[in-house]
């Protein structure tokens, strides 16, 4: 319904313009007809008046309407003679002979080219001016209103927005309004300004309703990153998926590595992945969640890290921006990870210690060899404890004398890089918090079997360590008569001390 009203309004506007054009054409035709008729009638009248009467033979009288006589009377006493080049005084207006009479007669000189011919443009100037004036009057009579306003120099200014939303005829008022960042438009008639304002208000109040729903491509593209973020937020891995990625690392050969842009670092206990540019992002992220990713050489656009947590990707981008040599150079991401753990339906994330820096040369794909598959729950517990010990050793290397900067830190991941200055106090606090999460067995995200094995290793490194697993072992030893052996294993931690009284023997970690 709204579209029909708009079309009818446009139809009325076009009809008005068509009528104005027709009126112009009619005015021009009428003026041309009037010009032609008046010119013919005026010429006949002048020709009739300029022909002298033929007197009877022997009765020649001077004709006062003669062109020569009339012209001499108007011009005055002197006239330049073109034949003699001298001025002669006019004494008598009467021609001296028939010879002069014939020369001055318009009948004898019918061509109308003689200077004394009354049909000369000089003589017809007055009548022509009268005809032109009549033509202009006819045109003004049939001219539309907006053309009359244009000829008079009148303008209408339309203001579309603001409190002064109307049309004006004075530019001074419109100029003051335009200083307030309001737009205006100039028209030659009031009708055009009114139509323009009405159409503008209609477009604002009634938005365009398309016959078919328009599907925007940008909405579909904007939905994809949200989908990626939701999936990437799931950092845990199922046991079946872990077993597949574990077997892939042990059984992959050179052909698989070249095709999928990775190679494996094989040892007796496990195999880890090293990914190069253009590796499959999902495979890289799966290996990271499984704790089997060792080194990543990402592309300049970091497409391999598309499924990683947002905080890790943002920290790597900031590192490339702030480090001058890393803007265009290749970088490496070296990862020390533990193995995830599963207890019935509960899944625990692995711990990660990440180092980033500038890669010296591009990595070539070395040959990967097929290893013997050794997959069991007991072997996984052993590998998990060894990987936690490796992360703990990397954290102990950071102290006040080292030049390390912490780029990212969370409950299960810490990212560091080399720095030109000494490690700051804030970074040391972050390292201490992350290390306390590993040492505090009660807060460690893993199963009981892993906690018991990890407690045994922590007691070797931190002499003042005391946890519930230490107390359980001490209680069982006291009942069996092995109190002395328990005291040797924990010489600085008496069994009477509560768990709250434990303190880390790590001087470089500030108090938190």
UniProtKB/Swiss-Prot annotation:
Keywords in alphabetical order: Host cytoplasm, Translation regulation
Subcellular location: Host cytoplasm
Keyword Cell cycle carried by entry: no
Organism of derivation: Figwort mosaic virus (strain DxS)
Protein family per UniProt: Belongs to the caulimoviridae viroplasmin family.
One Gene Ontology cellular component annotation held by this UniProt entry: host cell cytoplasm
Region (Disordered): 76-123, 474-512
Biased composition (Polar residues): 476-487
GO biological process terms, semicolon-separated: regulation of translation
Other noteworthy facts: The inclusion bodies are the site of viral DNA synthesis, virion assembly and accumulation in the infected cell.
Composition-biased stretches (Basic and acidic residues): 499-512
Function (record text): Enhances the translation of downstream ORFs on polycistronic mRNAs derived from figwort mosaic virus.
Protein name in the entry: Transactivator/viroplasmin protein
